[in-house]
Amino acid sequence: MKTYDLIIIGGGPAGLAAAVAAKDNGIDNILILERDKSLGGILQQCIHNGFGLHTFKEELTGPEYAARFIEQVEERGIEYKLNTMVMDISLEKVVTATNREDGILLLQAKAIILAMGCRERSRGALNIPGYRPAGIYSAGTAQHLVNMEGLMPGKEVVILGSGDIGLIMARRMTLEGAKVKVVAELMPYSGGLKRNIVQCLDDFDIPLKLSHTVIDIEGKHRVEAVTIAEVGPDRKPIPGTEERYTCDSLLLSCGLLPENELSKSAGVELSQVTSGPVVNDSFETSVAGIFACGNVLHVHDLVDFVSQEATAAGKNAAAYIKAGEKDAQAVMLPISPEGGVRYTVPSFVRPSEMEENLTVRFRVGDVYKNKVIAVYFDDQLISKKKRQVMAPGEMEQVILKKNKLEEYPETKKITIRIEEA
């Protein structure tokens, strides 16, 4: 059995950034395992621009952004295996993987970074009524067909869900000559970034119908029409609000789920809100020596934030490998999301071990206008940040300062909540 200091599962933007950071922090024996035929992950099919504004201070396409990190991996001589499927991670950090060249691989790791990304909700998970003809795709599948294979999924399109991929595909299909008739969103707010709504829908006069869902799909062999209806506060269709659209394709953009089957086999505790691992300030999971970053941890809007978190995870994994497993556990303070905050990453902070400035990222559960993000140490208000608009589709963040925590050594809990301005 071959032994590595660090095994990174996933060669997308998170895995690449984590590998580079670990190498730069003194770890040489690193292996990246990637199930696709190339590094770069989902970025390879995201040929639109808008990437890299934070990381490189310039606007790049997805493949360009990935290429910069792939170049850094190659320059550092970091080993990677492509077309390699990881099947299991044991409690002893033994990774079982398979590929055509090596057959079954058993690899022992001192530390593991989980960077498997996320997947789309399928039609089956959405329980849409109607027939099951050809022409129903997830937005990511349609994106792969158009951008990677040069194939058009359809000419007349209805999109269910207003996640970022759905919004971007509304624009992409329009640019390729299709007619996007409507984007329907179950919730009373969009699940995507404001800039994507403007650039992908408003600029192309594509209607967005909030509080609407698909209630019927017609067609025996191919999609012929879909019926959408308005939904009430209980998210059930309101009789009499039905609208029928003739179309040959239905794209589904109804949310992303972190890909955590391997995390479960490794015994990692998962969050009920994000479906990703519960991590502390070093991005270490409930299992010592297993770290997580990127969309496997929680779904991001911007790849730049993925790279930032992955860089921190890589650096912390390197520190763990050098120090070995510590018997004495540092004091862990829980970060409690309350009053409109759905979750936080990280979920725990170790005041003695944390960086001087720790970025805590979170999402809100509804649209809020002219509110403040309040941070409390127990019942003591520490900071307030005013925000004009907050929406579930846009990630928020606050900075926790180590020196501030040291001023309140008796703190038992950190609370982040939304309050009136």
For each feature predicted by the language model, list its residue ranges:
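Mid-to-C-terminal Rossmann-like scaffold of FAD/NAD(P)H-dependent oxidoreductases
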Residues: 304, 312, 316-385
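Short, aromatic- and glycine-rich surface loops/edge beta-strands on solvent-exposed regions
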Residues: 360, 373, 403-421
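Predominantly flavin-linked oxidoreductase catalytic cores and closely associated redox partners
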Residues: 104-105, 111-208, 213-222, 289-292, ...
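Beta1-alpha1 glycine-rich phosphate/pyrophosphate-binding loop at the start
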Residues: 4-68, 72, 144-147, 153-199, ...
